[in-house]
């Protein structure tokens, strides 16, 4: 409904609660997507509170780590900390108060489009190359690799930290825990926000054991026979790990997505 964390887009969704209720009456449940990144926005009270209380992951020098996702530059909640999980979980209240009963946690590996530092270095390199009127293969393919290397760069995952009871831990060493801890933040919050009620929750990134808080789906895939086979093989595997609620984008949503293939 919005790219900010604390409010709804009233122009597009003037009465989101009524929309959810009307859809439910038609047998359709509204399931909003919740991303891990919180937009860098000084006017957003959720963002300000997260900064003031130190709930976000930090760089080696202790300043908040920033990288871009869908809303642009964002901070990332330190889900390994119980108090940060509790704080993030409370943010679902704006939606549960509207009668929304299901949530889709996404981009929670966390996915990173780029970091400001790496983007600046890319533009500086591109500017230098732009002054040439003849790029050789090394220049050209180096530029291509640098574009592709902006997303989910290992260097970025090595550049921020979590605060734990055992001390500061660099993110890349606990990367696989992050999505599962976001799942836990939401699942534990729903015990308070929607007591004695069932809440649909599924996530793109998770860990074994997080099935006690929510389900999982197998993430983004291509519309190809090889990835369809991979999904068929993976779903029983995650179910054997406890994720009885699991699924996949069976028809895919990139490459050859003709409707006839989906019907097969």
Please report, for each region that a protein language model flagged, where it lies by residue:
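Catalytic-domain carbohydrate-binding cleft regions of carbohydrate-active enzymes
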Residues: 1-261
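Calmodulin-binding IQ motif helices
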Residues: 264
């Amino acid at each position: 409904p919005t790219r900010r964390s604390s409010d709804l887009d009233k122009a597009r969704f003037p009465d989101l609660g009524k929309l959810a209720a009307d859809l439910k009456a038609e047998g359709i449940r509204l399931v909003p997507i919740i991303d891990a990144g919180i937009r860098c926005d000084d006017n957003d009270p959720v963002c300000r509170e997260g900064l003031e209380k130190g709930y976000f992951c930090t760089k080696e020098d202790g300043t908040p780590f920033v990288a871009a996702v869908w809303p642009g530059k964002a901070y990332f909640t330190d889900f390994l900390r119980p108090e940060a999980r509790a704080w993030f979980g409370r943010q679902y209240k704006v939606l549960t108060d509207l009668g929304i009963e299901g949530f889709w946690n996404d981009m929670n590996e966390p996915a990173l489009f780029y970091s400001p530092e790496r983007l600046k270095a890319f533009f500086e390199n591109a500017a230098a190359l732009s002054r040439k009127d003849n790029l050789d293969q090394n220049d050209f393919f180096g530029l291509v690799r640098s574009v592709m290397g902006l997303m989910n760069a290992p260097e970025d995952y090595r550049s921020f930290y979590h605060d734990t009871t055992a001390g500061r831990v660099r993110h890349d060493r606990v990367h696989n825990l992050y999505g599962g801890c976001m799942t836990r933040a939401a699942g534990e919050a729903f015990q308070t926000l929607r007591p004695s009620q069932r809440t649909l929750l599924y996530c793109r990134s998770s860990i074994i054991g997080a099935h006690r808080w929510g389900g999982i789906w197998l993430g983004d895939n291509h519309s190809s026979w090889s990835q369809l086979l991979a999904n068929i093989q993976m779903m029983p595997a995650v179910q054997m790990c406890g994720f009885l609620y699991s699924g996949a984008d069976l028809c895919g949503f990139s490459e050859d997505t003709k409707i006839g293939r989906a019907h097969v």
